[in-house]
Curated annotation (Swiss-Prot):
Superkingdom assignment: Eukaryota
Record's protein name: Oleosin 14.9 kDa
InterPro entries hit by this protein: Oleosin
Family label: Belongs to the oleosin family.
Keyword Transmembrane: yes
Residue ranges, compositional bias (Basic and acidic residues): 1-22
Transmembrane region(s): 38-58, 60-80, 81-101
GO CC, one annotated term: membrane
Predominant location category: other
Function description: May have a structural role to stabilize the lipid body during desiccation of the seed by preventing coalescence of the oil. Probably interacts with both lipid and phospholipid moieties of lipid bodies. May also provide recognition signals for specific lipase anchorage in lipolysis during seedling growth.
Amino acid sequence: MADQTRTHHEMISRDSTQEAHPKARQMVKAATAVTAGGSLLVLSGLTLAGTVIALTVATPLLVIFSPVLVPAVVTVALIITGFLASGGFGIAAITAFSWLYRHMTGSGSDKIENARMKVGSRVQDTKYGQHNIGVQHQQVS
């Protein structure tokens, strides 16, 4: 009976500690969330304040120097675009030549040789056909 009573008391105390732990855990989670959220909110406010101050200082300078800055920015953008396009076209050309070289000297070279032979035989057939037509035309005349 005493064992059953202890077991019952232990069960009650375990239940109460298990209930206390989730509450404490929830409180720690809430405190951590509030601390992290508050810190991020303060950093966000400081960033906003810095941006407003920087715009306040920079706006008059941008207005004064805009006749010089706008063409300079456009020129720099065009130069950068030109260099990037030139590099892209160069890479495309190198890739095409590399593929062509590998295809001509590698496994595709026999296909190209066969195609060249077929074209050559067609040219010979065409020349022979034209010669025969010319001979027939001369014989008819």
